[in-house]
């Protein structure tokens, strides 16, 4: 079975980004069309190794596209009940960047709009 990288691997890969397209995508789209969408809505390179998330119109389906060294990989999940809860999205935004932990929470059914973060030290990048 092929699976996404483990969350612990994602957390250690500080250069990996997780992008969520804010508008629903046609779930019939596959590798090439999703790669085009990833580039147009995020402005990021689909070959970068970052994760690009696309949800279906009903909110119960999610596709994650990423480049895996020698080709695209696509992960697809359909919920039997409920919907994926999205984070707060600014009006007009075409995509939003998530932390790997937020992706894990979203996949576990946690409503990202109601999550409260405690203040933590973050080293500023040069």
Where are these regions (language model features)?
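Polybasic/polar functional segments that serve as interface/processing modules
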Residues: 1-126
